[in-house]
Structure formats: structure tokens, C-alpha cells
């Protein structure tokens, strides 16, 4: 059974129970592999200072490699909100460009994200919508 690292993209203000419930649903739905889930807030805490800016961190989520290998550190980007902020929108856009699978859980339904749409707002926290 392969182990797949999954980046959990969530809003900064999502509560831990909401995030955990989404991870449990993912595990139940996609049980053929072993998964290691890394919350966005943990990756951000571990890497942002070293990388120096948001753009570098967003790219590192998608293009960064596992230590000592050429394998990307995340095989799946898992989004738990359809409406997202700028950082998640950028991560998803990089992932789509790189061919990394992006999975969305929205109202209990899983789908594969195909695009990111900018909404008619200047809200950096909720100004983009994921399209399946």
C-alpha cells in the first residue's frame, strides 16, 4: 500500500473539529492508500520563516520535495472549503499547473478541482472559488 502525503488546505479560522471531520471523511472515502495528512497551518509554521514570503511558501507546498528525494512532498492537495483565500487559491493554481491532484470536500461531496475563479470582491480571505 502506497503512502501519500496530503496537504490539507483550510482557512486560518477553521476550527480544529471541522478540519478533523474533513480528514476523517477523506480517510473513509479513499481508503485504498495510506495517507499522512499535514494541515496547512503546520506546514506554514514549519516553513514560512525559512522561505521568507507567501509566494515562496505557496510554491513550496506544490513543488517542494521530500528530504533526500526528488519526490514532491505532497501528492494531493485537499481543500475543505469551496470559497478560499488568496494563499489557497495560489496553491491550487500551482497544483493544477503542476498536475497535482486537488480534491475538494464541499457539503459532504468529494470532487476534483479543475479551476480557480476570482470572485467580485477584494476579500483576501474569501475572494476565490474552486471549480470542479
What is the meaning of each model-derived region?
Residues 1-132:
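Conserved catalytic or regulatory cores that recognize and/or transform ribose-phosphate-containing ligands
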Amino acid at each position: 500500500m502506497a503512502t501519500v502525503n496530503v496537504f490539507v488546505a483550510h482557512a486560518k479560522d477553521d476550527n480544529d473539529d471541522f478540519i478533523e471531520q474533513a480528514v476523517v471523511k477523506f480517510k473513509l472515502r479513499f481508503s485504498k492508500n495510506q495517507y499522512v495528512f499535514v494541515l496547512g497551518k503546520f506546514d506554514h509554521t514549519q516553513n514560512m520563516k525559512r522561505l521568507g514570503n507567501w509566494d515562496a511558501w505557496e510554491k513550496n507546498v506544490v513543488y517542494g520535495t521530500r528530504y533526500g528525494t526528488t519526490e514532491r512532498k505532497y501528492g494531493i492537495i485537499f481543500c475543505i472549503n469551496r470559497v478560499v483565500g488568496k494563499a489557497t487559491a495560489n496553491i491550487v493554481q500551482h497544483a493544477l499547473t503542476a498536475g497535482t491532484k486537488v480534491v475538494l470536500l464541499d457539503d459532504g461531496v468529494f470532487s476534483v478541482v479543475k479551476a480557480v475563479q476570482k470572485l467580485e470582491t477584494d476579500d483576501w480571505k474569501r475572494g476565490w472559488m474552486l471549480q470542479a
